Amino acid sequence: DDRMVILEDTAEIRCAAENAVCLHTSDTIDMARLLKSTMRLRPDRIIVGEVRDGAALTLLKAWNTGHPGGVTTVHSNTAMSALRRLEQLTAEVSQQPMQAVIGEAVDLVISIERAGRGRRVREVINVEGFSGSRYQTEHYAQIDEDIHAA
């Protein structure tokens, strides 16, 4: 059983896994600090409800230190713009471009949009890395199935 550590500002994720730990930010503990503390919990998977600030860099570094298979959400218009959004978030705490770190840590981006009373997968890209001045990606076909919240 993989040990999952779930980090959120607001408790929204429901997880049925037996080996899961849920932690939440507070007025005195922000997401970056929570992520750093998470490393001591020996996680196999790090799940962040939503990354909105420079904590994105801490998350990407954690994923690149033997904690693959993590999940987060980021608001953007397309799958490619999600990668650019991660660049913007990491720029809040680093003057160095972080495209290589993003290209190493992120494997898959799934873009979901609202559709009627539910949501649907708009686009899926596989991220293979960053080289030169662009992300190396493979685009998968659009999936048109509706996803309804339970």
Regions found by a protein language model. Give the residues of each.
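Conserved P-loop NTPase
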Residues: G103-A150
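Switch/coupling sub-region of P-loop NTPases
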Residues: D2-A105, S111-A115
